[in-house]
Amino acid sequence: MVGCMTAPSTPFARLRQIDCRVEDLRDLLANPTSPVLTFTDQVEQQVPVYGATTLRQAIATDEGSATVEAELAEVLADGPGIFVITGALEHGVIDRVSAAFEEIITTERAKGGEVGDHFATSGVNDRIWNALEKLAISRPEDFVDYYANDLIALASRAWLGPGYQVTSQVNVVNPGGVGQTVHRDYHLGFTSPEVTERYPRHVHALSPVLTLQGAIAHCDMPVETGPTLYLPHSQKYSHGYLAYWVDEFQEYFAQHHVQLPLAKGDAVFFNPALFHAAGSNTTSDVRRMANLLQVSSPFGRAMETVDRERIVTAIYPALLSRTAAGHDVQQAVAASAEGYAFPTNLDLDQPVDGMSPPTQADIVRQALAEGASVEDLGARLTTHATRRTS
């Protein structure tokens, strides 16, 4: 036992690791609150499972989309903290992007150097950092087809609202690869306990709503391949950012987690405060590939630096061609271009038609609407970037 829970002197007293008790987590999980689920196909090991077809029918109208988003947000906040969408991406798109990721991995291996991993032994598995930008530069048309996905956008809007920022990191757990230790994710999931204790209590509650974690299965993932382990409802534990470091909590997670097999093209989204860890791949011949999505609120900042102007310039011809063919590429624009107007230089970049100046995404959408050339878009983006510089 780590220590006794002591009542805080005020509602804003700092949380302390010494006050973390497994008993408190166990009691919370024994009496979970569960939202009313209207659109699920099934519930598996406490986790709502939505079918892509069911969701697409439900979000065909603005009212329907808002209703679904409200349900997904409640699942993430007050429910189990996680949901699965089966068949979220088409296999053809997945296979093309998987091939691109394999090429990137091969190229980066040839360059040498160690690739770190936050929660697993470095070098055991394969990682692609900033996979979003690397995919856009190497395979712009595949990027557009992948990130034009309406269900990735649905999950992102449900938790974060509009203007979200997408980053991605590819994780390949090789045969025999050992899984991760239990953790929470960005932001406070990436600070030491000593630093985490310095953040006020309300920031512990704020951190999870700044980010949505997701993963796209790029291959079939039966349990023996080590799909991610989760502890449903653990995102509600107030001391969780301090607790997951503690041995007793790690042991509790090992004994009580759930593990959902996934099929290629399935997507899982979860609250970043949910206790979770990638599993061990006990197979001898399956390289388990997942594209890990980290979607950030426009009110926060993403973990990775991403050259979004470079991405947009690279994929713009593909955006034009897909638009001309009648495809909706707005979600791909949202995943690539900066969708938030601030910070900016308000002496130069002043609001014209509203409370804020146009965003980079606005520039791209306007260019697409006009059928502007790549060169014209480049000039507009340069002017826009110059206005935003102090």
Residues covered by each model-derived region:
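Fe(II)/2-oxoglutarate
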Residues: 1-78, 332-343, 347, 351-390
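A structural signal for short, well-ordered beta-strand segments
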Residues: 170, 214-216, 291, 295
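Flexible loop/turn segments at secondary-structure boundaries
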Residues: 91-93, 174-176, 222-224, 237-238, ...
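Non-heme Fe(II)-dependent double-stranded beta-helix
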Residues: 29-193
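Short conserved micro-motifs at the rims of enzyme active sites and ligand-binding pockets
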Residues: 96, 227, 241-242, 280-282, ...
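Catalytic core of non-heme Fe(II) oxygenases with the double-stranded beta-helix
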Residues: 154-155, 180-181, 188-252, 257, ...
